[in-house]
Curated annotation (Swiss-Prot):
Primary subcellular site in the record, as a coarse category: membrane
Membrane-spanning segments: 5-21, 40-56, 63-80, 137-155
Role, per record: Required for disulfide bond formation in some periplasmic proteins. Acts by oxidizing the DsbA protein.
Keyword Kinase: no
Similarity-based family: Belongs to the DsbB family.
Database matches in PANTHER family: DISULFIDE BOND FORMATION PROTEIN B
Source organism of the structure: Nitrosomonas eutropha (strain DSM 101675 / C91 / Nm57)
A Pfam match: DsbB
Record localization: Cell inner membrane
Protein name: Disulfide bond formation protein B
Ranges in the topological domain labelled Cytoplasmic: 1-4, 57-62, 156-162
GO molecular function, one term: protein-disulfide reductase activity
Entry annotated with the keyword Disulfide bond: yes
């Protein structure tokens, strides 16, 4: 079961790496919602790596599974919001948002601006693969991570109660 968490960590690292590739090589600038999703991928990936390395017992597993579910849910909510904004651009407000000002003011944005500085347009849906935009794919991936952690948690809970 530990290998699943290594795979989740590697998937998160690959997704973050691909986001940086799109930003630096293709010029697709991240918006505030993209940065929040990157942070969620970081949190999921680090939690999965800790789970893999630590190999916790019962209580620790519940905590790690719960954190992955929480971070996946947060990422899915943000990705869903961005997917909605792309489909309904008239609901989008132009100008610097409070989220952008908040994110760009964080020490992380000063320390690693390529990763954490938001300067893109949230309703830019130009990148597509199989007719799905980046936030659509991100929503599916966050859902998958949450479902995997939920199933593992359920399996662990059932094995304890039997």
């Amino acid at each position: 079961m530990r290998i699943i968490f290594l795979l989740i960590f590697l998937a998160c690292a690959g997704l973050i790496g691909y986001a940086l590739y799109l930003q630096l090589m293709d010029g697709l600038l991240p918006c505030p919602l993209c940065i929040f999703q990157r942070i969620a991928y970081w949190l999921i990936g680090i939690t999965a790596l800790f789970t893999f390395i630590h190999n916790p017992q019962s209580l620790g597993q519940h905590i790690y599974y719960g954190l992955i579910i929480l971070f996946s849910l947060a990422g899915a909510i943000v990705a869903g919001r961005q997917a909605w904004l792309i489909r309904f651009p008239e609901a989008f407000e132009c100008g610097i948002s409070p989220e952008e000002a908040f994110l760009n003011g964080l020490p992380l944005a000063q320390w690693w601006p390529n990763m954490f500085e938001a300067n893109g347009d949230c309703n830019d849906g130009t990148w597509q693969f199989l007719s799905l935009t980046l936030p659509d794919w991100s929503l599916l991936i966050f859902a998958a991570f949450g479902i995997i952690a939920g199933l593992l948690w359920h399996k662990k809970y059932n094995s304890i109660n039997q």
